[in-house]
């Protein structure tokens, strides 16, 4: 069971989490025009668009044929999270009258692709944006929702305005204690060990592993940090860093049986110290606080990982918290 926010959904009316019963009020398709294609995923094609009524830029996510229930889930989750810190805003839901293909209309974020952007970051930028991402994660977890697909591709950053948005809630799900969830979620490089060993009773802490994998790639300048060629190889790549003895301790604790395919590929590995990943190119991002923070995220045992709220209180973010306090103080000065 999750260490935090375990009973959020059971304390809410059924209509909050029972997405099957959601009623979609469709907007007017003709209010939107496609400008250009900006991306595609497994479940959708994404376009920059324009609202022809008010000439506001927007993002149009055209959903590929998928179960109605999945579409309802994404919409319900976005509605429940509306107005939360750094959560992408769902503006409208429309559908084509002929094909019945639904599209989700979102706020536009002037994103720079992470492979271009992250190398430009300084140490403070990394701290700042990870802190902004933690705000979104703590908020969604506090609302009883796991994102289940945290990765750089789903974190939009408008660097000029220092604005971050967590996007793509298509795999997100409501957390109910004791429920067994599908382990075929998240993207390979960001899958937590629980998914790779087929442990289905996972919780919000899955998102904290994904955040840790993302953070490791940012501070060590190694993208992705765990570079598996398949799901089984992904666990091997993790074990080469965190150690096999530690993996078996985790499996024993939760009485998890490892799939027989691992017999041939796992081997035995000593835990690698985090400092061994430091080199001339990445040392400016790495501090004792950064390593301590990373170490408290990338744990096999999901119950040992920091929660999003605990993470925000970590000393690594002291400069970010100080800056925010200073900004509030200065804003107060200008008002008075």
From Swiss-Prot:
What the entry lists under Pfam families is as follows: Pkinase
Q: What's the Enzyme Commission number for this chain?
A: 2.7.11.1
Self-association state and partner proteins as the record states: Tetramer composed of two alpha chains, one beta chain and one beta' chain.
Task: Name the domain of life.
Answer: Eukaryota
BP terms from Gene Ontology: DNA damage response; regulation of cell cycle
Protein family membership: Belongs to the protein kinase superfamily. Ser/Thr protein kinase family. CK2 subfamily.
| Protein keywords | ATP-binding, Kinase, Nucleotide-binding, Serine/threonine-protein kinase, Transferase
**Chain sites annotated for binding ATP:** 38-46, 61
Q: Where is the Protein kinase domain?
A: 32-317
Q: What is this protein's name?
A: Casein kinase II subunit alpha
Q: Which reaction does it catalyse?
A: L-seryl-[protein] + ATP = O-phospho-L-seryl-[protein] + ADP + H(+); L-threonyl-[protein] + ATP = O-phospho-L-threonyl-[protein] + ADP + H(+)
UniProt GO cellular component terms: cytosol; nucleus; protein kinase CK2 complex
What organism does this protein naturally occur in? Neurospora crassa (strain ATCC 24698 / 74-OR23-1A / CBS 708.71 / DSM 1257 / FGSC 987)
List the active site: 149
Q: What does this protein do?
A: Catalytic subunit of a constitutively active serine/threonine-protein kinase complex that phosphorylates a large number of substrates containing acidic residues C-terminal to the phosphorylated serine or threonine. Phosphorylates the frq clock protein thus regulating the circadian clock.
What GO MF terms are annotated? Answer: ATP binding; protein serine kinase activity; protein serine/threonine kinase activity
């Amino acid at each position: 069971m999750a260490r935090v926010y375990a009973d959020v959904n059971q304390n809410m009316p059924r209509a909050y989490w029972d997405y099957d019963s959601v009623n979609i009020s469709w907007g007017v398709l003709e209010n939107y025009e496609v400008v250009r294609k900006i991306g595609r995923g497994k479940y959708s094609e994404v376009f920059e668009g324009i609202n022809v009524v008010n000439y506001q830029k927007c993002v149009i996510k055209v959903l590929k044929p998928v179960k109605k229930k999945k579409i309802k889930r994404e919409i319900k989750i976005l509605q429940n999270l509306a107005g939360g810190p750094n959560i992408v805003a769902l503006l409208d839901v429309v559908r084509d009258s002929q094909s019945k293909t639904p599209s989700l209309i979102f706020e536009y974020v002037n994103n720079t692709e992470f492979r271009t952007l992250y190398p430009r970051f300084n140490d403070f930028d990394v701290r700042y944006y990870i802190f902004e991402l933690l705000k979104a994660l703590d908020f969604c977890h506090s609302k009883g929702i796991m994102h289940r697909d945290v990765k750089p591709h789903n974190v939009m950053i408008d660097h000029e305005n220092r604005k971050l948005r967590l996007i793509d809630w298509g795999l997100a799900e409501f957390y109910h204690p004791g429920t067994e969830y599908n382990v075929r979620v998240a993207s390979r490089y960001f899958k937590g060990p629980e998914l790779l060993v087929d442990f289905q009773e996972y919780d919000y802490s899955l998102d904290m592993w994904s955040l840790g994998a993302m953070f490791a790639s940012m501070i060590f300048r190694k993208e992705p940090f765990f570079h598996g060629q398949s799901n089984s190889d992904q666990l091997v790549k993790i074990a080469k860093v965190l150690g096999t003895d530690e993996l078996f301790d985790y499996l024993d604790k939760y009485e998890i049986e490892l799939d027989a395919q691992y017999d041939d590929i796992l081997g035995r590995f000593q835990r690698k110290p985090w400092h061994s990943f430091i080199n001339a190119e990445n040392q400016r991002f790495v501090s004792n606080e950064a390593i301590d923070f990373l170490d408290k995220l990338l744990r096999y045992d999901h119950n040992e990982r920091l929660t999003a709220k605990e993470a925000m209180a970590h000393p690594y973010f002291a400069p970010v918290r100080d800056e925010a306090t200073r900004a509030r103080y200065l804003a107060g000065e200008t008002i008075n």
